[in-house]
C-alpha cells in the first residue's frame, strides 16, 4: 500500500469573507481538512476610540460609542454614562433606572436574535435568519418610537435618560413581550432537535470551566462552560435586584451549550422587561441635580453676535481627579471602562475592555485539531462584532 505524505497548506480566510462577522482575517494552516494552526489578524476596523475619548466631553463622545458594538448600542451608551456617574457619585432617579433596564434588555434580545440568524446561516440553515428579522424589526420599532433612532440611539444621559417614554409605549412593549415568548419556543422547535444542527454543534469547540476562567472569558461564553456568573447579579447595578430572574448557564462548554444559554437569556430578558414595565415608578427621568456639575458658560455666548450663529453649549461635566473601573453585562460579555479623571471636562485616560476582543483570543485553541468547516461554527458561537474588537 502506497502512503503519500501531504504537505500543510496555509489558507487566508477574510477579511472579506461573508462568515467572518466583520473585517476579520484568519490565517489557517491545514493538513487536508484538519486545522493545525489558526492566527487571527485584527485591526482592520481600528479607529482610535480610546484616544478620541481623551479630547471629547462625555456628551460629545456619546455618538462615537454606539459605533463599537453597533448591534447592541444601548450597552455601550450605558457604560459610557455609568463611568462618570460612579466617579462623581451622581444618583440616578428610580424611573430612569427602570427605563435603562428595559432598554438594555430589549437591546440584549435584538443582539441575540441577530446572533442566532447568521449563526444558523453559517452552519447551513437559512430559514431561521428570516424568522429572527421579523421580531428584531419590532424591537427596532420600539427603539424608534422611544428614542427617535432605530440604531445609534444616543438615549442615555449622565443622571438619567434623554427623554421620557412616550404615551402608549409601555402597552406597546408589553404586547411585544406577549408576542415574542411563543416565537422563542418556535425557534427551539425548529432548531434544537434538528439532527443536522446537532451534528454540527454538539461536542464542537469545547472549553471547560477552568480554561474559560483562565482565558478571561465572559458572558455566554463563560456561562456555557459551567460558571454561573452574571454581572447583573454580581454587581447589583441599576434595579436588577428588584426583579425576579435567573442566570442561564450550561456545563458542556460546546457550541450547543452557547446556543442554549443565549436562547434562555432571551426568555429571561422578556421576563425582566415585563416586570420592569409593570413596576416602573413615576417621577423624573433625569437627575437635575447633576446639572450642578455643569461648568460655567462663557459670558460671550450671550452676546449679540452669538444669537445669529445658534451657539448653544452642551452640558459639560468636570470629571473628578480619581480613577474607577466600571463594568456591565453586555450581550456578548463583560463590557468595562477604566476611567481616569484629572479634574477636567475631558477624561485623562479612557480604557475600553470589550468582551468580543477577549473572547476572540480563545479561537485558535478551540479550532486546533478540528475540521475546516468547524471554524465557522466555533467563530459564530463566540459572537463577535469587529467594531468593538478593533475599537
Curated annotation (Swiss-Prot):
Transmembrane feature ranges: none
Cellular component GO terms held in the UniProt record: chloroplast thylakoid membrane
Keywords of the record: Chloroplast, Membrane, NAD, NADP, Plastid, Plastoquinone, Quinone, Thylakoid, Translocase, Transport
Subcellular location, record wording: Plastid, Chloroplast thylakoid membrane
A family per Pfam: Complex1_49kDa
Annotated catalysed reactions: a plastoquinone + NADH + (n+1) H(+)(in) = a plastoquinol + NAD(+) + n H(+)(out); a plastoquinone + NADPH + (n+1) H(+)(in) = a plastoquinol + NADP(+) + n H(+)(out)
Primary location group: plastid
GO molecular function, one term: oxidoreductase activity, acting on NAD(P)H, quinone or similar compound as acceptor
Membrane topology classification: Peripheral membrane protein
Keyword match Cytoplasm: no
GO biological process: photosynthesis, light reaction
Listed HAMAP family: NDH1_NuoD
Family of the protein in this entry: Belongs to the complex I 49 kDa subunit family.
Family matches, as NCBIfam families: NuoD, PRK06075.1, PRK07415.1
Known function: NDH shuttles electrons from NAD(P)H:plastoquinone, via FMN and iron-sulfur (Fe-S) centers, to quinones in the photosynthetic chain and possibly in a chloroplast respiratory chain. The immediate electron acceptor for the enzyme in this species is believed to be plastoquinone. Couples the redox reaction to proton translocation, and thus conserves the redox energy in a proton gradient.
Protein name per UniProt: NAD(P)H-quinone oxidoreductase subunit H, chloroplastic
Gene: ndhH
Amino acid at each position: 500500500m502506497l502512503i503519500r505524505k501531504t504537505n500543510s497548506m496555509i489558507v487566508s480566510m477574510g477579511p472579506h469573507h461573508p462568515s467572518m462577522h466583520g473585517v476579520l482575517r484568519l490565517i489557517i494552516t491545514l493538513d487536508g481538512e484538519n486545522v493545525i494552526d489558526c492566527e487571527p489578524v485584527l485591526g482592520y476596523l481600528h479607529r482610535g476610540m480610546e484616544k478620541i475619548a481623551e479630547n471629547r466631553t462625555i456628551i460629545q463622545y456619546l455618538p462615537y460609542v454606539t459605533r463599537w458594538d453597533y448591534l447592541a448600542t444601548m450597552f455601550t451608551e450605558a457604560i459610557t454614562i455609568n463611568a462618570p456617574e460612579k466617579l462623581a457619585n451622581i444618583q440616578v432617579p428610580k424611573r430612569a433606572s427602570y427605563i435603562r433596564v428595559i432598554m438594555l434588555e430589549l437591546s440584549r434580545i435584538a443582539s441575540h436574535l441577530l446572533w442566532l440568524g447568521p449563526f444558523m446561516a453559517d452552519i447551513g440553515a437559512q430559514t431561521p435568519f428570516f424568522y429572527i428579522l421579523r421580531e428584531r424589526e419590532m424591537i427596532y420599532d420600539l427603539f424608534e418610537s422611544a428614542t427617535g433612532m432605530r440604531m445609534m440611539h444616543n438615549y442615555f444621559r449622565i443622571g438619567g435618560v434623554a427623554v421620557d417614554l412616550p404615551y402608549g409605549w409601555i402597552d406597546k412593549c408589553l404586547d411585544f413581550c406577549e408576542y415574542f415568548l411563543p416565537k422563542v419556543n418556535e425557534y427551539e422547535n425548529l432548531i434544537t432537535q434538528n439532527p443536522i444542527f446537532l451534528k454540527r454543534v454538539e461536542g464542537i469547540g469545547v472549553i471547560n470551566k477552568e480554561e474559560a476562567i483562565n482565558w478571561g472569558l465572559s458572558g455566554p461564553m463563560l456561562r456555557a462552560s459551567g460558571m454561573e456568573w452574571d454581572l447583573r447579579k454580581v454587581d447589583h447595578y441599576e434595579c436588577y435586584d428588584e426583579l425576579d430572574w435567573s442566570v442561564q448557564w450550561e456545563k458542556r462548554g460546546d457550541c450547543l451549550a452557547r446556543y442554549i444559554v443565549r436562547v434562555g437569556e432571551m426568555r429571561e430578558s422578556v421576563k425582566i422587561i415585563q416586570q420592569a414595565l409593570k413596576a416602573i415608578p413615576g417621577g423624573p427621568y433625569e437627575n437635575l441635580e447633576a446639572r450642578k456639575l455643569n461648568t460655567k458658560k462663557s459670558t460671550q455666548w450671550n452676546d449679540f453676535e452669538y444669537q445669529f450663529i445658534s451657539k448653544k453649549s452642551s452640558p459639560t461635566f468636570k470629571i473628578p481627579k480619581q480613577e474607577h473601573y466600571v463594568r456591565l453585562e453586555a450581550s456578548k460579555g463583560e463590557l468595562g471602562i477604566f476611567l481616569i479623571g484629572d479634574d477636567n471636562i475631558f477624561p485623562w485616560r479612557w480604557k475600553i475592555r470589550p468582551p468580543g476582543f477577549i473572547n476572540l483570543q480563545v479561537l485558535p485553541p478551540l479550532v486546533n485539531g478540528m475540521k475546516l468547516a468547524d471554524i465557522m461554527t466555533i467563530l459564530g458561537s463566540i459572537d463577535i462584532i469587529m467594531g468593538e474588537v478593533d475599537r
